Swiss-Prot record:
Belongs to the PsbZ family. It comes from Nymphaea alba. The keyword Transmembrane helix applies. It is a multi-pass membrane protein. This is Photosystem II reaction center protein Z.
Amino acid sequence: MTIAFQLAVFALIATSSILLISVPVVFASPDGWSSKKNVVFSGTSLWIGLVFLVGILNSLIY
Protein backbone atom coordinates (compact mmCIF):
# COMPACT_ATOMS: atom_id res chain seq x y z
CA MET A 1 0.00 0.00 0.00
CA THR A 2 2.89 2.34 0.71
CA ILE A 3 4.24 1.87 -2.82
CA ALA A 4 0.84 2.81 -4.29
CA PHE A 5 0.76 5.92 -2.11
CA GLN A 6 4.27 6.92 -3.15
CA LEU A 7 3.46 6.40 -6.83
CA ALA A 8 0.27 8.45 -6.48
CA VAL A 9 2.18 11.29 -4.81
CA PHE A 10 4.85 11.15 -7.52
CA ALA A 11 2.15 11.23 -10.23
CA LEU A 12 0.53 14.22 -8.50
CA ILE A 13 3.84 16.09 -8.34
CA ALA A 14 4.64 15.27 -11.98
CA THR A 15 1.17 16.33 -13.15
CA SER A 16 1.40 19.55 -11.13
CA SER A 17 4.77 20.36 -12.68
CA ILE A 18 3.51 19.69 -16.19
CA LEU A 19 0.41 21.84 -15.65
CA LEU A 20 2.50 24.59 -14.06
CA ILE A 21 4.48 24.90 -17.27
CA SER A 22 1.88 24.05 -19.92
CA VAL A 23 -1.10 26.16 -18.83
CA PRO A 24 0.68 29.54 -19.11
CA VAL A 25 2.17 28.46 -22.43
CA VAL A 26 -1.30 27.57 -23.74
CA PHE A 27 -2.73 30.92 -22.62
CA ALA A 28 0.21 32.86 -24.08
CA SER A 29 0.06 31.28 -27.53
CA PRO A 30 -2.11 33.08 -30.10
CA ASP A 31 -4.45 30.19 -30.89
CA GLY A 32 -3.60 28.05 -27.88
CA TRP A 33 -6.74 28.10 -25.78
CA SER A 34 -9.18 27.24 -28.53
CA SER A 35 -7.04 24.40 -29.84
CA LYS A 36 -5.74 22.99 -26.52
CA LYS A 37 -8.81 23.46 -24.33
CA ASN A 38 -9.53 19.72 -24.09
CA VAL A 39 -5.93 18.93 -23.12
CA VAL A 40 -6.00 21.51 -20.32
CA PHE A 41 -9.33 20.21 -19.02
CA SER A 42 -8.08 16.61 -19.18
CA GLY A 43 -4.93 17.50 -17.26
CA THR A 44 -6.94 19.38 -14.67
CA SER A 45 -9.34 16.45 -14.27
CA LEU A 46 -6.39 14.10 -13.83
CA TRP A 47 -4.91 16.42 -11.21
CA ILE A 48 -8.19 16.58 -9.25
CA GLY A 49 -8.52 12.79 -9.39
CA LEU A 50 -4.97 12.37 -8.12
CA VAL A 51 -5.61 14.78 -5.24
CA PHE A 52 -8.56 12.65 -4.12
CA LEU A 53 -6.61 9.42 -4.64
CA VAL A 54 -3.69 10.68 -2.53
CA GLY A 55 -6.14 11.75 0.18
CA ILE A 56 -7.86 8.37 0.23
CA LEU A 57 -4.59 6.45 0.24
CA ASN A 58 -3.22 8.70 2.97
CA SER A 59 -6.22 7.95 5.19
CA LEU A 60 -5.74 4.21 4.64
CA ILE A 61 -2.04 4.25 5.48
CA TYR A 62 -1.89 6.53 8.51
